């Protein structure tokens, strides 16, 4: 006979290891607030030291190092190839947007420290317990999305590390200054700082999607039971039981919506920064590919340029799946509303059961996907818009490139 552990999926056996890895990696960057699934409470003294370290590390990124790189700005962009210099300017702008996102992330984490812990982390843990006995089919897509995100992020980290080593190897040849290597490391740290929070937000939204799907399955099961009601002496008793269960489901649905709303409210400015960074990354990617194709042979293309192009593509995919999760949440809410419209009314409808159905239907009308800063919906349309906008700016860069080529 197989043991219970052998019947578990790989994710179920190692789930908490993934969460612990994410928490430890966030602690390296001073983000104590990021704890996917709290497993062991930190001692007060250790927590105070980690918070102090987080403030010092953030001040180093926000105040000290930018001054150093601004002082060496000319060194960062100095090159005899004017077309390559244009690429440096675009990359510098990309890092500047990451820097602004880091500032927003630091302020948000500081201001919403307790709120993120209570309204996101603990609320998600509470909902996980509430849906412990719910249908487990929605866990499989959730596991896939988490696997994919984990592999993609680690692949992007390895690509950036390879790019840094490539630049470091060229320093000895005198083709790239030491300052540019430092700047590449700085950009890598900025990306990790913002990505930690983006991954946490992705985790919360992925959990919201899973809970909505489990909620919809429970709602469908309850609907099937209502369809099976027959007139008789126990009808009112069954209606009372169904009313209690529907009231419980309505409370859970409200908690799921509150979790998504609070997560968006506290992370919306960081997500806006992520969208802007994606825009510049796509612009850099388009122009990098053009820069490669404009060369007479691929042998003349530097290795960091190729690595940067691959990284920008991965960054776009990363942003796309973040938006895709929100797209699926919107579709799942529509599916829940459809399930509610299909509720059958027994011949002798209990007044309380009717009231619960009406209350849940009315609440679902107000459960619209939250907007970023009240301006934009984070869905696939926004990602497509970013790609089109980046391509439009890319055409402008190509015009500058052609002008510089003629001038040289």
Curated annotation (Swiss-Prot):
It holds the Pfam family 7tm_7. The chain crosses the membrane at residues 21-38, 49-69, 87-107, 145-165, 271-291, 305-325, 382-402. Keywords: Cell membrane, Membrane, Receptor, Transducer, Transmembrane, Transmembrane helix. It is a multi-pass membrane protein. Residues 39-48, 108-144, 292-304, 403-408 are extracellular. One of its GO terms (molecular function) is taste receptor activity. Its main location: membrane. Residues 1-20, 70-86, 166-270, 326-381 are cytoplasmic. The keyword Membrane applies. GO terms for cellular component: axon; dendrite; membrane; neuronal cell body; plasma membrane. It is found in: Cell membrane. One of its GO terms (biological process) is signal transduction. Probable gustatory receptor which mediates acceptance or avoidance behavior, depending on its substrates. This is Gustatory receptor 10a. It comes from Drosophila melanogaster (Fruit fly). The gene is Gr10a.
